[in-house]
């Protein structure tokens, strides 16, 4: 089957924003204007098409990135048909994992900002993630019809808070109630949308007289930004004092894809103005899969290899999202980087070392689906019938292996015990939890050996609350949930230069003999665990060395202070001995475990607690109270900024243990007028009095 849309006309984009910037409404309008759905969904009444999980519709927040395909021929029908794959990303901090995983497979992003609130804490998180994956982006200032809307203020914030380089492509005509349209700085014409047709019709007109001066000033900046793309254009600009429309668009496209600038637009999605021009900008300035460098990976021997976005290349794709669907079962969303995949094909998963057969292939629209026969390079689609794939894994050609760079998933910082309410729920709960953990790598499930309880861990209170809720709705499991617990860690502060572990059992016949001498050293934060084999002269035979490493690794999940996982430790095996008859792997595992535990005791073990970056936006009257409260929670206030339009943003670093129930507390302190976001920053040593309490509580 030949390609319907050339790859140059693909755009894989994400719509990303702070919680209330109006991202879902913006996405809805995109789907409406591209002719996908004919009744506009509104988030307020819970009918938005992209928010297809029940909890999202109840809470009015977007949790899962649904992927949707739409087609666009331009606002004035002046482009050949382009295919836009939209990945909807969540705007809540507990779901940064979702943002992160969608950034990994995007080619470009539209960052939506509120014209009143401007750049908010979550906007910075999302911006950092887009930087990390080098995603070209454009900015859309939404809610221009709201009281206090100010496009140019948001422009200043993008420069100061995000250190972005925004280049307005349009400027607003009016603001608040009088916002009627935009001045297109490329065409130097006014665009006024027709309200009766819900913005599907528009007309170009002359720039209003009172805006001519402002429009000329911003047009000048736009042309300068374009001219800076090459010496040739700069010379042309200097000679003629101007550039034509094609020159400007080609130059801005080059600079946007290179990450040097971010085209900036504005409108009000709710009132059907401006989104249409933003879609044109997506086509004009954001990259197609062919514009971005070939994807990097490794072959079976670990050598670097590349695959370019071409149907003729061997197949490679990344599974970036798993979902349970009530009708078809498990759906795996994949981004195809190279080659072609047909239903019925067999593919290889290099991480699991397994082959899988592809069942049906689906092209998703927010909550309905179209069955397709094949997917091509650059496509995003859903596969039915994969059994062993987890989020972040590669699928590739069975004869031409490639392992694409894996996604990084944060470690969970909060845990809760869950217990099924009845015997009937017991079996279903195990299945439900393993399915949810497969979908979401930042959610972990384990069973506590001492208490026999099932412990779930995640990125925040809301994250776990929603997963327990999904367990009830999707799997029919009723469960009781314990109090949230902090995920502490243990590490060492000093070296232990020599510690011995000896496991000897002499009984009639075959005994056990393992003897190791280790050196333990602390690693810098985030160092994890490192094992070094420094054995000389075969005092410990080669075949037992992996057993020593394994013995230590099996000891790591439960430290000696309070049974929390041990991190940031380097263990060096440098001496030992063995017995010709009695030595075996098990004996060396036991000896290593004994040595490691004793070594930790001698190396100043300490308890680490998760520290959270907290940002509170509050009216000025309550700023002192909020700061006092954060300090009383062992928080370190790191700064306070003014919010445009009044109020303060307070930044602090606070231990997670002190932040439970903070939302309720903050509401009562500020009469419900403050909001906050919180994300994991790093682990830090817990003060002695806190550590003593935690250790005592665990010892009970």
Swiss-Prot record:
Q: Which parts of the sequence bind GTP?
A: 17-24, 88-92, 142-145
Q: Name one Pfam family in it.
A: EFG_C
One GO cellular component, as annotated: cytoplasm
Source taxon at top rank = Bacteria
- Keywords from the UniProt entry: Cytoplasm, Elongation factor, GTP-binding, Nucleotide-binding, Protein biosynthesis
Cell compartment(s), UniProt: Cytoplasm
Q: Name one GO molecular function term.
A: translation elongation factor activity
Q: tr-type G domain: from which residue to which, for each copy? A: 8-290
According to its UniProt entry, this protein's organism is: Bordetella bronchiseptica (strain ATCC BAA-588 / NCTC 13252 / RB50)
Could you tell me which SMART domains the record lists for this protein?
EFG_C (SM00838), EFG_IV (SM00889)
Q: What does this protein do?
A: Catalyzes the GTP-dependent ribosomal translocation step during translation elongation. During this step, the ribosome changes from the pre-translocational (PRE) to the post-translocational (POST) state as the newly formed A-site-bound peptidyl-tRNA and P-site-bound deacylated tRNA move to the P and E sites, respectively. Catalyzes the coordinated movement of the two tRNA molecules, the mRNA and conformational changes in the ribosome.
Task: Name the family.
Answer: Belongs to the TRAFAC class translation factor GTPase superfamily. Classic translation factor GTPase family. EF-G/EF-2 subfamily.
Q: Protein name, please?
A: Elongation factor G 1
Q: A biological process (GO) annotation for this entry? A: ribosome disassembly
Task: Supply the PROSITE patterns for this chain.
Answer: G_TR_1, G_TR_2
Xref: PANTHER family: RIBOSOME-RELEASING FACTOR 2, MITOCHONDRIAL (PTHR43261:SF1), TRANSLATION ELONGATION FACTOR G-RELATED (PTHR43261)
Which InterPro entries has this protein been placed in?
A: EFG_II, EFG_III, EFG_III/V, EFG_IV, EFG_V, EFG_V-like, EFTu-like_2, G_TR_CS
């Amino acid at each position: 089957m030949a390609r319907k849309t050339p790859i140059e006309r693909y755009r894989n984009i994400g719509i990303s924003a702070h919680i209330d910037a109006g991202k879902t409404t913006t996405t809805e309008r995109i789907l409406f204007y591209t002719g996908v759905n004919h009744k506009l969904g509104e988030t307020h009444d819970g009918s938005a098409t992209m928010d297809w999980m029940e909890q999202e519709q109840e809470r009015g927040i977007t949790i899962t990135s649904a992927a949707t395909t739409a087609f666009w021929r331009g606002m004035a029908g002046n482009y050949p048909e382009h295919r836009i794959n939209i990945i909807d990303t969540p705007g809540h901090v507990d779901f940064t994992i979702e943002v992160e995983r969608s950034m990994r497979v995007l080619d470009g992003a539209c960052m939506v900002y509120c014209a009143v609130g401007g750049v908010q804490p979550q906007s910075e998180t999302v911006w950092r993630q887009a930087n990390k994956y080098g995603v070209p982006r454009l900015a859309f200032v939404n809610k221009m019809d709201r009281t206090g809307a100010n496009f140019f203020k948001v422009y200043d914030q993008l420069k100061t808070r995000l250190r972005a380089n925004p280049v307005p492509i349009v400027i607003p005509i009016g603001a608040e109630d009088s916002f009627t349209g935009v001045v297109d700085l490329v065409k130097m014409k006014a665009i006024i949308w027709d309200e009766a047709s819900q913005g599907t019709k528009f007309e170009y007109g002359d720039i209003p007289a009172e805006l001519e001066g402002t429009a000329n000033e911003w047009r000048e900046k736009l042309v300068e930004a374009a001219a800076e793309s090459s010496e040739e254009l700069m010379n042309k600009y200097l000679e003629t004092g101007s550039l034509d429309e094609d020159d400007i668009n080609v130059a801005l496209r080059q600079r946007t894809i290179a990450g040097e600038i971010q085209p900036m637009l504005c409108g009000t999605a709710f009132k059907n103005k401006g989104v249409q021009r933003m879609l044109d900008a997506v086509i004009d300035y954001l990259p197609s899969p062919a514009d971005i460098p070939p994807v990097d990976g490794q072959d079976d021997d670990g050598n670097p290899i590349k695959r370019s976005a071409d149907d003729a290349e061997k197949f490679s794709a990344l599974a970036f999202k798993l979902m349970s669907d009530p009708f078809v079962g498990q759906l795996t969303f994949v981004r195809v980087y190279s080659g072609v995949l047909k239903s019925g094909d067999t593919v290889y998963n290099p991480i699991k070392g397994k082959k899988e057969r592809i069942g049906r292939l689906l092209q998703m629209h927010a909550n309905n689906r179209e069955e397709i026969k094949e997917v091509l390079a650059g496509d995003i689609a859903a596969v039915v019938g994969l059994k062993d794939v987890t989020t972040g894994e590669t699928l590739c050609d069975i004869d031409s292996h490639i392992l694409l760079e894996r996604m990084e998933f944060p470690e969970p910082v909060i845990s809760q015990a869950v217990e099924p309410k009845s015997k009937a729920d017991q079996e279903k709960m195990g299945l439900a939890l393993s399915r949810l953990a497969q979908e979401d790598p930042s959610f972990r499930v384990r069973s506590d050996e001492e208490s026999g309880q099932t412990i779930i861990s995640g990125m925040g209170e809301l994250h776990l609350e929603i997963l327990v809720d999904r367990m009830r709705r999707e799997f029919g499991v009723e469960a009781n949930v314990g109090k949230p617990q902090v995920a502490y860690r243990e590490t060492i502060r000093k070296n232990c230069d020599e510690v011995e572990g000896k496991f000897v059992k002499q009984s009639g016949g075959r005994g056990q003999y393992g003897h190791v001498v280790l050196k333990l050293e602390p690693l810098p934060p985030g160092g994890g665990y490192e094992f070094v084999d420094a054995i000389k002269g075969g005092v410990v035979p080669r075949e037992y060395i992996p057993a020593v490493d394994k013995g230590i690794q099996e000891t790591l999940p439960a430290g000696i202070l309070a049974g929390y996982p041990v991190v940031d430790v380097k263990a060096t095996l440098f001496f030992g001995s063995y017995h010709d008859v009695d030595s075996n792997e098990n004996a060396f595992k036991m000896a290593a475990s004994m040595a490691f535990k004793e070594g930790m005791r001698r190396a100043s073990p300490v308890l680490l607690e998760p520290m959270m970056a907290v940002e509170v936006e509050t009216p000025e009257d309550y700023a002192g109270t909020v700061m006092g409260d954060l300090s009383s929670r062992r928080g370190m206030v790191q700064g306070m900024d003014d919010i445009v339009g009044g109020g303060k943003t307070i930044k602090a670093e606070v231990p997670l243990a002190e932040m439970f129930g903070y939302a309720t507390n903050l509401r009562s302190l500020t009469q419900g007028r403050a909001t906050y976001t919180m994300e994991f920053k790093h682990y830090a040593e817990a003060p002695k009095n806190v550590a003593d309490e935690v250790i005592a509580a665990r010892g009970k």
